[in-house]
Regions:
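Short runs within selected transmembrane alpha-helices of multi-pass transporters and secretion channels
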Residues: 65, 133-151, 159-167, 192-208, ...
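Small-residue-rich hydrophobic transmembrane alpha-helices
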Residues: 44-103, 107, 140-154, 158-159, ...
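Transmembrane helical elements of multi-pass membrane transporters/channels
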Residues: 13-32, 132, 136, 166, ...
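N-terminal transmembrane alpha-helices
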Residues: 3-34, 38-39, 55-67, 71, ...
């Protein structure tokens, strides 16, 4: 077990700051929701619609940028430090292009928003919010590229410090622009977009300055010279990153589809489902951080041409994710009523939500396993097949089963519980498939590297 404990330490060392960063991003969104909600119902609704659109698009594009981590991680393990700097400069062109494209989409989102059957008092806030935040997503894309570069070399603490500072700065900026403090215009929910853009710019500049002056990055010479866009690097990023982005989109679309299917059952069901999903998402940050850490750790070891240790790291990731998931499940089951009570005091919503978070507790195990496997597979630069397996698991199994059980069941419709049954079945199928894929990739890499560099007799 000593070899696994060593990898546990490595994953925890890399993963804890990543967890802190993810928590900071989540709290930033929660701050926007709380402050906009106190400005008025329309402001909250407008912000909710705006973030629903922007987050879905952003998570797809951020998946593409996540390709930077395994690319850098493998080069770092191979000690090709100057090539890391060269790759970063070339990938920044890709990130800038994606960021500008996103900004263009959000700035012109009114074409789609105005077609929705939503009150104009809400859509006007949504449109103005998306315009305000549009250039901010460009800054976030550049920040994410630099973040993944840093994390690929195991330097995760600086990203956490900057993300945490950004979260703290977002609070006063929200108050200033939402409520019109200190002579600023009172913008309501739109003010959250202004605050997000300012914070994103400061975070981007902060990480750029830190990387420029910290001795940790000097050996890669990230900004020592100018590099033109590279077609080969662009293809590499898109080949690796597009499946990651599509995989994230497939997963998000399953949750969105579940909400749409349940929407016909009334506001109590929708509200209860939203509470349960939100709780599951918060606990999901633990395996997410471990999975992202594994992408770095496994990538480093593959770069070192050490497939045996990479296999141990990947196995340790799964073990750590299972342990974390079981702890999460115990917490959810033990304190379920209390946690739900923090979200709502309405008795019908509370009662149904309490029953649903029992499913959220079961949800943790397959969700944790799949996140650990996905993270490890990214470290091996294996992203296309996992995306196909994800599509099959969620849209061939989870959604049809969930829809049938919700509306028909076995004699009686199961309602929201049926949808959760379907999602758990789909997740369980994918967790098994992803483990099988990981085992195959690990064995293939051991064979390939042993042929390339046979052990001395």
């Amino acid at each position: 077990m000593a070899k696994y404990f060593f990898e546990f330490k490595q994953l925890i060392r890399i993963g804890i700051p990543i967890f802190g960063s993810q928590l900071s991003y989540t709290l930033m969104g929660a701050t926007d929701t709380i402050i906009a909600g106190r400005a008025g119902a329309n402001d909250l609704a407008g912000l909710a619609v705006g973030t629903a659109f922007s987050n879905t698009i952003w998570f797809f594009f951020t998946g593409i940028i996540f390709a930077v981590t395994p690319i850098v991680a493998q080069l770092y393990g191979a000690k090709k430090f100057l090539e890391i700097g060269q790759k970063l400069r070339e990938i920044l062109w890709v990130a800038a292009g994606l960021g500008l494209f996103m900004a263009f989409i959000f700035f012109n989102m009114d074409i789609i928003i105005n077609l929705l059957p939503i009150k104009s008092s809400i859509t006007s806030i949504t449109i103005d919010y998306l315009k305000a935040v549009s250039i901010g997503w460009f800054f976030v894309t550049i920040f994410t590229c630099l973040r993944c570069y840093s994390e690929g070399m195991t330097y995760t603490k600086p990203v956490f410090y900057i993300a945490f500072a950004g979260m703290l700065l977002n609070i006063p900026l929200d108050l200033i622009f939402v409520y019109g403090w200190f002579g600023a215009p009172k913008l309501g929910g739109v003010g959250c977009g202004i605050a997000t853009t300012i914070v994103s710019f400061i975070m981007m500049i902060s990480i750029f300055i830190y990387i420029s002056f910290s001795k940790n990055y000097k050996k890669t010479q990230p900004f020592s010279k100018f590099s033109k866009p590279s077609l080969a690097t662009t293809k590499e990023v898109l080949k690796l990153g597009l499946p990651i982005g599509l995989g994230i989109f497939i997963e998000l679309s399953m949750f969105s589809g579940a909400a749409i299917i349940l929407s016909v059952l009334g506001e109590i069901v929708v509200a209860s489902h939203s509470v349960a999903i939100n709780i599951a998402s918060l606990f999901f940050m633990v395996p997410l951080a471990i999975g992202l850490a594994s992408s770095t750790r496994v990538g480093n070891l593959i770069g070192e041409k050490n497939p045996i240790q990479a296999k141990i790291a990947a196995t340790s990731t799964i073990m750590l994710c299972i342990s974390g998931a079981l702890i999460n499940s115990v917490i959810i089951i033990s304190f379920g009523s209390f946690i739900v009570g923090l979200y709502t005091t309405e008795l019908p919503v509370l009662e149904l939500a309490v029953s649903l978070i029992l499913f959220a507790a079961i949800f943790q195990l397959p969700d944790g396993i799949q996140m650990g496997a996905l993270g490890s597979l990214r470290g091996y630069k294996d992203t296309f097949i996992p995306m196909i397996l994800l599509l099959i698991s969620y849209w061939v199994f989870a959604m049809p089963i969930g829809y049938y059980l919700t509306n028909y069941g076995f004699g009686d419709p199961l309602g929201a519980k049926g949808m959760w049954f379907g999602m758990i079945i789909g997740l369980t199928i994918f967790s098994f498939l992803s483990i099988f894929r990981l085992r195959w990739v690990m064995k293939s890499n051991i064979k390939r590297i042993s042929v390339e560099e046979p052990l001395p007799l």
